[in-house]
Amino acid sequence: MRMRARRACAPPQRQFQRPRRRPLRLRIGAARPPIRSRPTREGNRADALCDRAARHLDITMRGDDMQDPQPDALPPEPFVAPAADGFPVRGFAWRHRAPAAGRPVTVINCATSVRCRYYFRFAAYLFSQGSDVLVYDYRGIGESRPASLAGFHATWLDWGRLDCDAVLQYAARTCAGQPVDVVAHSVGGVVLGLAASNPIVRRALTVGAQYAYWRDYAGSHRLRMLAKWHVAMPMLARVFGYVPAKRLGWMEDTPRGVALSWSRSRPRFEDAYVRAPIRETPDARRDLVERFTRLTAPMLAIGLSDDEFGSVEAVERLLGYYTRSAVTHLRIAPEQIGVASIGHFAFFHSRFEQTLWPIALGWLKTGALAPETPGRVHRQPCAPEPARAARDEASGRTAAR
């Protein structure tokens, strides 16, 4: 009886218990493949924020913009150029075996957070045309990246005053007696002006060079680019201590100071450096401007009509700092070479080896544009002072008559 009473008081047992299952979550409408999360809390947080930014802000670059060109045909040799602060700036060199004092050595300055390997095909082309070539990565990028970018200090100023200067000195030292030329892409045209050794440059060529003042962006892209580069990018830099740009498909991961250099750009380049943590003293900011005036090499600035960064206003804003260089500003539209688009990056794609690259090669060899060069010259160098005086005198005589 007692046993029956106990059984009668016991709670009824379930005949069947459904196993628990995790809810299935589908990612619908994602324009990009899901990002694999890191096995850490910080990594998961970064991936979640980056994925959310890419999907909701629609701020990833077009896929064909940042694809690396085909692998290089010639194996370059790695080199290290120690900067003035001791940082090892790393890159690759194409060197001819037979020494020749008259052979030029061309230094290639990269765009912001674009690896130097992106320019390998163009470097191999210049090498095949008789030039020695050096390509390198700025500190924090590619071959010059430290183990961790979180807390790593680097700005555009460091890339110019330290890294570019170190490579120019390395070129002069290891290629003694050879003329030094520079090809500069995007911000590479800025860091050239900041390098104290820029007086050694014989000729300079820039492609889409500017310092990213947002009002100069192409009108149809301006608001989107403002949100991406001047709002989202500094926010990511503040959260993570650097910009995890590679996971977003933008570019290489970027040091915080570089992101601030970019996002704080003002009409005057030096005015981006008035607030911490990238603040420069008033004397140092005046020195920045003076450094650009040391470059006396003739410069060809190439701008592409469909480059949302390199508008006429943006390129001219930077060229205004090179007051002692004879500057030629050439504008090229895609239809003038029979293609649909070129944009900010594609100049260095090997598909333009027969159309755009000969323009660069001709300028580096002769310092002049060939008569058949496509495009429109927006600005030509001013007449030399003696010729200008003679012209003014002749016009004065004509007016007197």
For the regions a protein language model found, what residue spans apply to each?
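Catalytic active-site module of serine/aspartate enzymes centered on a nucleophile-bearing elbow/loop
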Residues: A333-D392, G396-R397, R401
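N-terminal cap/lid segment of alpha/beta-hydrolase-fold proteins
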Residues: Q67-A93
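Short alpha-helix in the alpha/beta-hydrolase fold that links the catalytic acid
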Residues: A297, S311-Y321
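Active-site glycine-rich loops that stabilize anionic/oxyanionic intermediates
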Residues: A111-V114
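Alpha/beta-hydrolase-fold enzymes
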Residues: V183, V187-R275
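Alpha/beta-hydrolase active-site loop
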Residues: H153-R173
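Short beta-strand/loop motif that positions the catalytic acidic residue
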Residues: L295, A301-G303
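Conserved alpha/beta-hydrolase
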Residues: C116-Y118, A123-A147
